[in-house]
From Swiss-Prot:
Disordered, as annotated region: 24-61
GO molecular function, one term: toxin activity
Signal peptide: 1-22
Protein name: [Thr6]-bradykinyl-Val,Asp
Coiled coil (residue ranges): none
Compositionally biased intervals (Acidic residues): 30-41
The organism of origin for this protein: Agalychnis callidryas (Red-eyed tree frog)
């Protein structure tokens, strides 16, 4: 019985460790994707011409 308890605890511990490693990798990839999106947005802002705040090119009166 003691052998079963030890092996069960070992399996659960190893499963928890592998799960935490997977979560960490997932978090890192999400952060990289967010950084890429932010870089794209900043590039788009740099390429667009400067306009005063509140300016809209299509005004409907």
């Amino acid at each position: 019985m003691s052998f079963l308890k030890k092996s069960l605890f070992l399996v659960l511990f190893l499963g928890l460790v592998s799960f935490s490693i997977c979560e960490e990798e997932k978090r890192e990839t999400e952060e990289e994707e967010n950084e890429d999106e932010m870089d794209k947005e900043s590039e788009e802002k740099r390429e667009s011409p400067e306009r005063p705040p509140g300016f809209t090119p299509f005004r409907v009166d």
